[in-house]
Amino acid sequence: MSEPVDPEAPLDEEPTDLDPTEAEPEEPGSSALRSFLGLFIVPLLVVLLCVAIFIGFGWIAYDRQSTRDYLGDLESGWKPRRVQAAYELSKILVSDPRALDKEPGAKAQVRRLFQEADDPEMRRYLALVLGRTGDREALPLLTAAANDEDDRTRIYALWAMGILGDARARDPLAKALSDEDSGIRKTAAFALGELRDPSAIPLLQPRLDDAVTDVRWNTALSLARLGSDAGVPVLETMVDRRLLAQVPDITPDQQEEAMLGAIRALAAVSGPAHKELFERLAKEDPNLKVRQAAMEAEKAVSSGR
């Protein structure tokens, strides 16, 4: 259907004086057109409005569903509902990691659906659900998914392995550190830090010289989480706005995130040596969150915490 003509479009020239009492002759077919508009277009618009209202209230109600409701929706025959349910469950588990413990058979159900799912988006969210439940039986499934044909599914699987926190994930994650895809390397570096296993330190250290900035940053942050100061030189670059500005395509939000993470990491592994840096950032940095993080780091260092 063609786009409607704008009834308020300006005329090309000023109108001449017309007698308002004189009606213009009706063009042939205009009556039929009005009938068509009245009988078809207007009712159609009403129907569309009702559908929009119905969908809107449906989503509001959906947002209030329980964990059990979402588990049921994972079995739905409608793909969008299944994917949305997996996404909602992954969010619930962030605030309540034991949410599925309250539902008998839920973990086994998620493992089964993860194995059966052939939709990449569904598998990605289910991977996060598996990781956030702390279900150790899910590790073999996530390890296999780390070799999936879909790169984004691989990233979610690696991420979930880190969230799971099972030390047995160390070797599969270490293998991913040498992948040709920088997104895979970055996620593997992050996930190894989440394992809190110091034996991962020597596996991570070579990635401090990675050609990709994101990989170096995540490696340095993970090393700090593991108690190693090997990444301090990289962390120092992450709080230098002059160097951050040279990173291609970096956004202000990403700069802020990098600085906040680096400040906390430096405070944890090299605190006293960077006291002056924290003081300077607390006074001079233009970002409020960065100043606040630097003040907290300086206070922690001064108190010996």
Stretches found by the model and what they are:
Residues 77-78, 118-119, 149-150, 180-181, ...:
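Short inter-helical turns and helix N-cap capping residues of alpha-solenoid HEAT/ARM repeat scaffolds
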Residues 90-91, 131, 162, 193, ...:
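Structural signature of alpha-helical solenoid repeat scaffolds
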Residues 85, 126, 157, 188, ...:
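Conserved hydrophobic register position within alpha-solenoid helical repeats
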Residues 1-29:
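N-terminal intrinsically disordered, acidic low-complexity segments at the extreme N-terminus
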